[in-house]
C-alpha cells in the first residue's frame, strides 16, 4: 500500500510567507511529496498564487499609494469583501508588490522576509519544481543512487465561479499549463482541487489528472448555493454524497475535524466513519490543515502526536504548514507499521 503523502500547504508556510517561491523551495528541501499553490487570476488572465483574490492581508499593497484607487468592495462567493483584488491588476503590476506573513502574531520569525518576495505565477512555481527535480536527478546519478520520485504539485482553483463570471475561467488555462509542463494522465504527479463541485466536473472532462473535492466542516459549496441546489458539505460526506463524488474525483480533502473531532476541552475524540466510508467507494482522504503552533494543536499533543492519530485512522495524505515535521511523522508511522506487520 502506498505510504501517505505529505502536501506542503501553501509551501512551507510555517517557515516563510505563504505562496512565495522561497516557501515552496523550503518545502521541497524538507522532503514534501507535493507543494500546494492556491490559484487566482490577474486582469490579464495569468494564474498567480494567493490564498484569496483579496491581497491586502498578504502583500504591501495598502502602503502603495499608486494603487490606492484600486481599493474597492466586491461580492465574492456571496460575501462583501473590501480591499485590493488580483483581478484588478495586470501581472506586471502585481509583480511590483511584495508578500507579507499572514499571521505575524503567530509566526513572527517569518516577518524577516516581509518586503523581499514577489507573488509567483503558476509557471514560475512549475519551473521551480522542475528545476529541483533535475538537481535531484543529477545528484542521484553522481552518487550512483536510484532516481528519486518526482515532486508533485497540488493546485487549488480559488473562487472558480466568481472568476468565470468575470470572463477569467480557470479550468482550461490550468490544464493547458500543467500539460505543457508534462503533468498529464492519472499518474501525472498532480492533483487538482476545489471547494466547488461544478468546476471539478468540468475539469474531469478536460484531464485525466486526479481531482480532489475539498470539504469544509460546515456550509455549502458556492456553486451549489448559486444554482439553488440545497445540498451542503455535510450532504457531500454521506455515503450517497461520497458515491457521487467518486464519479468525478479520486479523493476528498476534508477539514480534519471531519476525520477526528475534538471535545469541548480540545482533545481528540474517536475517529468518525469518514475514512472508511471514503475507502468503501474508492476515494482517498487528504485532510487539512496540520500546524505545529500551539494555537492550532489539540490539547495534550504536539504536531507529530496529532499526525500519528490521523495516520492511524487511515488517511492517505495530509496538508501541513511544516513539511519537515510531517515527513518525520509519516516516516516514523510507516516504519512502525511495517515492523508490526513483519513481527
Identify the meaning behind each predicted range.
Residues 1-343:
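Phosphate-group recognition and catalysis centered on beta-loop-alpha active-site segments
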Amino acid at each position: 500500500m502506498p505510504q501517505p503523502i505529505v502536501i506542503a500547504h501553501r509551501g512551507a508556510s510555517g517557515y516563510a510567507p505563504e505562496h512565495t517561491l522561497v516557501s515552496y523551495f523550503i518545502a521541497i528541501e524538507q522532503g514534501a511529496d507535493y507543494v500546494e499553490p492556491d490559484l487566482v487570476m490577474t486582469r490579464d488572465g495569468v494564474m498567480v498564487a494567493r490564498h484569496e483574490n483579496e491581497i491586502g492581508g498578504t502583500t504591501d499593497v495598502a502602503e502603495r499609494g499608486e494603487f490606492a484607487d484600486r481599493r474597492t468592495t466586491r461580492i465574492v462567493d456571496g460575501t462583501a469583501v473590501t480591499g485590493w483584488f488580483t483581478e484588478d491588476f495586470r501581472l506586471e503590476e502585481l509583480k511590483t508588490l511584495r508578500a507579507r506573513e499572514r499571521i505575524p502574531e503567530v509566526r513572527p520569525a517569518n516577518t524577516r522576509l516581509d518586503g523581499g518576495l514577489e507573488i509567483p505565477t503558476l509557471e514560475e512555481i512549475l519551473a521551480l519544481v522542475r528545476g529541483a527535480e533535475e538537481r535531484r536527478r543529477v545528484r542521484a546519478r553522481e552518487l550512483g543512487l536510484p532516481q528519486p520520485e518526482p515532486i508533485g504539485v497540488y493546485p487549488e482553483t480559488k473562487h472558480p465561479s466568481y472568476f468565470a463570471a468575470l470572463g477569467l475561467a480557470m479550468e482550461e488555462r490550468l490544464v493547458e499549463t500543467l500539460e505543457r509542463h508534462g503533468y498529464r494522465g492519472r499518474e501525472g504527479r498532480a492533483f487538482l482541487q476545489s471547494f466547488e463541485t461544478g468546476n471539478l466536473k468540468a475539469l474531469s472532462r478536460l484531464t485525466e489528472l486526479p481531482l480532489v473535492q475539498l470539504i469544509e466542516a460546515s456550509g455549502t459549496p458556492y456553486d451549489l448555493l448559486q444554482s439553488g441546489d440545497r445540498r451542503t458539505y455535510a450532504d457531500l460526506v454521506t455515503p450517497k454524497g461520497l458515491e457521487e463524488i467518486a464519479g468525478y474525483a479520486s479523493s476528498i480533502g476534508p477539514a480534519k475535524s471531519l476525520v477526528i473531532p475534538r471535545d469541548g476541552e480540545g482533545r481528540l475524540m474517536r475517529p468518525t466513519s469518514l475514512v472508511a466510508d471514503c475507502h468503501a467507494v474508492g476515494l482517498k482522504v487528504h485532510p487539512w490543515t496540520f500546524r505545529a503552533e500551539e494555537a492550532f494543536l489539540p490539547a495534550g499533543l504536539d504536531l507529530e502526536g496529532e499526525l500519528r492519530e490521523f495516520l492511524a485512522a487511515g488517511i492517505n495524505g495530509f496538508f501541513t504548514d511544516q513539511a519537515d515535521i510531517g515527513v518525520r511523522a509519516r516516516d516514523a508511522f510507516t516504519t512502525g507499521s511495517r515492523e508490526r506487520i513483519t513481527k
